[in-house]
């Protein structure tokens, strides 16, 4: 049944009786009438249209409400940021990350091998640590001078913020080198796999952070595995053990200081690590001279050269160069991947170092010791998953 339409103030009407007389507006823009079939027959059944109610048709031009539709050209001065990666770009990114990881692990394994060779012949970890930082600093200065890499733009505020990070990095670096000079490389890295436990404890009691229950539960295999590996280590040394533990604690504080102080800074990646190495070198040099001194270095150097031969010099150069390269690649990788992926990669790196050092140095290891190492590393993997 068709109902009447209320007209506007200037509308017109047509009465319907028996037959329909229609007055079509001169300019019809819109009609609310339903489409009726058989338009050729202009008569309507009386049962369809009410006899009493007239049908009013009004021109759309008389309606008070109008809709204005306009089109605007997009502002080309501000392009849309649509982050859509094509399949080729995704494949290239995955390949790039894979190359970073493979290079990172390979460089780290080579560094640990040469570092242990140097420390076996030249047991002076303070000088060895200093040479590693000095070599990296020199390499980056040459890269900046020759424009192989763009020099970072820094100011005094940047170096002030970097100072506590450099102090923690220096302590962690020296402590790890002291540990490797006293115990096997594999044992040092097994203990260093317990770094997540230090991270949670420091963040909880010093920074006031809280973590979900799975994070705390993941610490149990880490702590238990490290303890099992320590008590079953055949060549256990308290200095080597404490050096690895101090290194864990120092690197945790380094990460905290870096996260809080360096957030939003323009320097990142390899330039950030280069600046960190230079400041750490300035901090470490006077302490190295005070703890060991040139006289001990000269006597130890002559003894190492007489035992090893000229290859000893190349060992020192190799361990210094590869130390900087593997750290540089790790910082470059962190710019390309998520913290979770980096943490998993770091766990796999530690496994490769432990296995390679056992094979190359023929490190004696008991089954229960290997079980402790496996439990600790597996706990590190669980921690990286639970942290997310």
Swiss-Prot record:
Primary location recorded for the protein, binned into one broad class: plastid
Domain annotation EamA: ranges: 113-231
Keyword line: Chloroplast, Membrane, Plastid, Sugar transport, Transit peptide, Transmembrane, Transmembrane helix, Transport
Distribution of this protein across tissues and organs: Expressed in seeds, flowers, stamens, and rosette leaves, with highest levels found in sepals and senescing leaves.
Domain of life: Eukaryota
GO cellular component, one term: chloroplast
InterPro entries in the cross-refs: Sugar_P_trans_dom, Tpt_PEP_transl, TPT_transporter
Gene Ontology biological process terms, A to Z: glucose-6-phosphate transport; phosphoenolpyruvate transport; phosphoglycerate transmembrane transport; photosynthesis; photosynthetic acclimation; regulation of photosynthesis; response to glucose; response to nematode
Cited function: Glucose 6-phosphate (Glc6P) transporter. Also transports inorganic phosphate, 3-phosphoglycerate, triose phosphates and, to a leser extent, phosphoenolpyruvate. Responsible for the transport of Glc6P into plastids of heterotrophic tissues where it can be used as a carbon source for starch biosynthesis, as substrate for fatty acid biosynthesis or as substrate for NADPH generation via the oxidative pentose phosphate pathway (OPPP). Required for dynamic acclimation of photosynthesis and partitioning of Glc6P between the chloroplast and the cytosol.
Identification of the protein by name: Glucose-6-phosphate/phosphate translocator 2, chloroplastic
